UniProtKB/Swiss-Prot annotation:
Region spans: Interaction with CINP: 118-156
GO molecular function: K63-linked polyubiquitin modification-dependent protein binding
Subcellular location: Nucleus
Phylogenetic classification of the source organism: Eukaryota, Metazoa, Chordata, Craniata, Vertebrata
Gene for this chain: ATRIP
Composition bias, Pro residues: 15-27
Gene Ontology cellular component annotations, sorted alphabetically: ATR-ATRIP complex; nucleoplasm; nucleus
Coiled coil: 108-217
Species this protein is from: Homo sapiens
Entry keyword set: Coiled coil, DNA damage, DNA repair, Nucleus, Phosphoprotein
Domain notes: The EEXXXDDL motif is required for the interaction with catalytic subunit PRKDC and its recruitment to sites of DNA damage.
Sequence segments annotated as region (Disordered): 1-57
Entry function: Required for checkpoint signaling after DNA damage. Required for ATR expression, possibly by stabilizing the protein.
Family: Belongs to the ATRIP family.
Post-translational modification, as annotated: Phosphorylated by ATR.
Protein name from the UniProt record: ATR-interacting protein
Amino acid sequence: MAGTSAPGSKRRSEPPAPRPGPPPGTGHPPSKRARGFSAAAAPDPDDPFGAHGDFTADDLEELDTLASQALSQCPAAARDVSSDHKVHRLLDGMSKNPSGKNRETVPIKDNFELEVLQAQYKELKEKMKVMEEEVLIKNGEIKILRDSLHQTESVLEEQRRSHFLLEQEKTQALSDKEKEFSKKLQSLQSELQFKDAEMNELRTKLQTSERANKLAAPSVSHVSPRKNPSVVIKPEACSPQFGKTSFPTKESFSANMSLPHPCQTESGYKPLVGREDSKPHSLRGDSIKQEEAQKSFVDSWRQRSNTQGSILINLLLKQPLIPGSSLSLCHLLSSSSESPAGTPLQPPGFGSTLAGMSGLRTTGSYDGSFSLSALREAQNLAFTGLNLVARNECSRDGDPAEGGRRAFPLCQLPGAVHFLPLVQFFIGLHCQALQDLAAAKRSGAPGDSPTHSSCVSSGVETNPEDSVCILEGFSVTALSILQHLVCHSGAVVSLLLSGVGADSAAGEGNRSLVHRLSDGDMTSALRGVADDQGQHPLLKMLLHLLAFSSAATGHLQASVLTQCLKVLVKLAENTSCDFLPRFQCVFQVLPKCLSPETPLPSVLLAVELLSLLADHDQLAPQLCSHSEGCLLLLLYMYITSRPDRVALETQWLQLEQEVVWLLAKLGVQSPLPPVTGSNCQCNVEVVRALTVMLHRQWLTVRRAGGPPRTDQQRRTVRCLRDTVLLLHGLSQKDKLFMMHCVEVLHQFDQVMPGVSMLIRGLPDVTDCEEAALDDLCAAETDVEDPEVECG
């Protein structure tokens, strides 16, 4: 339509021109504005309006009226029809002029455009309805998802709230239990402090009354209760019962003092400076004082017998740990050097041992290795170990004794490792005190020693001997604890032989102690031990203590030596053969343990340790060092001389039997040295020692009379048979066997006929034994013939 209307519009824009036609009086309305045409222009047949194409004002007003009525009264379709009708009427009226026919085509085109627009409108309206429906669907889905999300969030929030409440309840319950246990512990501590204060008050009254008695009756000689054997200890004062207060009376307290103090069993130890004979400072008195107070602590642990570590717990909490000693694990856990002597704050069971524990302040001044904080840390670890062992399951994975020599597998019990820092602390403290004592003896001025100066500064006058004497009790207790740990915990055995420290702080401190000990004036054995950097610090200290105790004398020193050897024996017994080379450093210390001054029980333990170490092919040849310190030579000399006059005959027989079986094991495993070494004096002494042992064993069987009936008699007969086989083996391998028998020829002549008759009369005698008897009897005749010719 735009192309159609363009010419018309172009013509309308031209200037008007006169138009030919009929005059105005012909009936057509005159044009409102005259239009003129150019002379060259011709009428356009396509123009529907012609020269009179413009609407009049009435026409425009009528169109506006129709449009407004159509918009306000009729719907879209009716509005279109009405407007079309009005337009037709208008156009019919206008068709009376000459150009009316051309104008009739305009409404048709407009109607077509209107229909197209209406179709587009309907299509867009349908699309809009579809979009609205999709929007409604999406809104519904969004609402559903939002509701589901809210519901899930509410569920999660409820679960989170319930979990938080549950955790809060658990925390509150644990806090309540902790407060309850703390109150109980404070109550027990207060009770112990109260009892301790009462004991101190009773001591003061007792001393006052004794001084008054001395002043009132100076002519009466005072007999110390400690030296009076006629005093009888009342059992009700020494053995408290559960639920009964065991507070000692004056008589029972004096009777308890008749027990000898460990420091005064040997003349080489001096009493504490300013201490009276009647002063109740013995360890036995302290144990009687605490036994009732610590019973509840012990019973609470022993009730947990349903766990795998109950056996170890019961052994550790036994009071006392060692017969003849008054100390236990409770003393090590409650020991401290903070409180001065005689105050209510003094820890339970400390009593007279405060002077010895003053070494804490002494050695702690060096590098903090034995400070009070280190002791508290070790005690806290030990308490943790008690809890872990009490509730730990017995695991046998990775057992160092697995596939080894134990009949039953060893439990791991890794919680037992937490006891090692406490044991290491007291053993290291004892080693430090021994070093101070040695330095004081070398300098000749014991008053200048660090231990002595610290004790004087702390208000307790004592000397290094007293400190060492008191610390020996704690060291023996720590060694006993270590023995139980090694016997029942595979984790402890693995840790001690692995070279890794149990506690970093304690390990570093004790490692510095080992270096101080090795840098001083020590023996070559101690220097050899300190040079091995792959050892566990506690194992190093154990070897140092073994060397110290084997060189000293005294009852407690013998106990320390025995406990050290027991720990080493159990450690070697519970480990596998692969770990036995770790014991190579023990050969440097064992010669001191076989000296004539060593008690027989310690020598017996040393032989048992050697028998265990001989199972390894690398360690067996080291029993003979081809020098004066040869272990076999020292052992032969100890057996033949029998220096321990206190030991029983049965103990000597047991030692001889263990030595015979050790030599039999060495002879089977290595037919060459050490049993028949040609360059060592032990090659000469072995014939003499075996002959002496054969004679003694034979006399024992002869005194018993008849066939063997008891286990001990059967062991003796077994030892006789093994000794005969050993002597026969030596006679076959040693060319100088005849010369070596000359010194014990009378014993050899006396014992061989009886031994031959005894062994041949046994029902299970073997051909080897009969052949050995024949050869030895023939050798006896060969030895006698030269003497007859000389005669």
